[in-house]
């Protein structure tokens, strides 16, 4: 999310970052949390979003999720389900949508998590910003996928950061 924010701001696009509440993350075994301690304060300082109604005025929406058992996290799924009361009115129709995910391994279900977020966006009537094959890094068309390692100890490298910037250059806002 930080890389997206920095890249979009370099393009003079105003950016707000939100996170969903994730009580599950607080219960993870310590060996998962060791590698993320340095990011804990930064993460917790991000405003929690509770409902889809909070993002109706944005021109573009980028969602990101860790991969839990081959899908988006439970809290992300609950957030997507919070749009059910606004779905019929289609207030997000035509807005740009992109997504990103992390997974422990290449075959850890990251593409399925990306597809779940894309399907959600399609049901909302949003316009998908696919990842073309020309974007550096060999990402799936569904969104940017970062392989974080079994213990989430692999951070995005320079190639990933360049890939994100290449992808976001396709925005027309």
Where are these regions (language model features)?
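Short, glycine-/small-residue-rich phosphate/pyrophosphate-handling segment
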Residues: 93-139
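A general structural signal for short secondary-structure boundary/capping elements
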Residues: 107-112, 145-147, 167
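N-terminal beta1-alpha1-beta2 submodule of the flavodoxin-like/Rossmannoid cofactor-binding fold
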Residues: 1-89, 137-140, 147-173
């Amino acid at each position: 999310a930080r890389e997206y924010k920095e890249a979009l701001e370099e393009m003079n696009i105003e950016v707000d970052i939100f996170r969903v509440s994730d009580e599950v993350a607080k219960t993870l075994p310590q060996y998962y949390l060791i590698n993320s301690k340095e990011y804990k304060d930064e993460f917790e300082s991000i405003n929690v979003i509770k409902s889809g109604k909070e993002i109706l005025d944005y021109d573009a929406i980028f969602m990101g999720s860790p991969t839990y058992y081959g899908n988006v996290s439970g809290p992300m799924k609950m957030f997507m389900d919070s749009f059910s009361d606004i779905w019929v009115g289609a207030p997000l129709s035509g807005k740009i949508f992109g997504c990103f995910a992390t997974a422990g391994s290449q075959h850890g279900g990251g593409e399925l998590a990306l597809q779940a977020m894309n399907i959600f966006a399609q049901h909302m009537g949003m316009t998908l910003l696919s990842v073309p094959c020309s974007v550096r890094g060999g990402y799936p068309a569904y969104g940017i996928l970062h392989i974080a390692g079994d213990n989430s100890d692999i951070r995005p490298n320079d190639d990933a950061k360049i890939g994100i910037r290449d992808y976001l250059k396709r925005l027309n806002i």
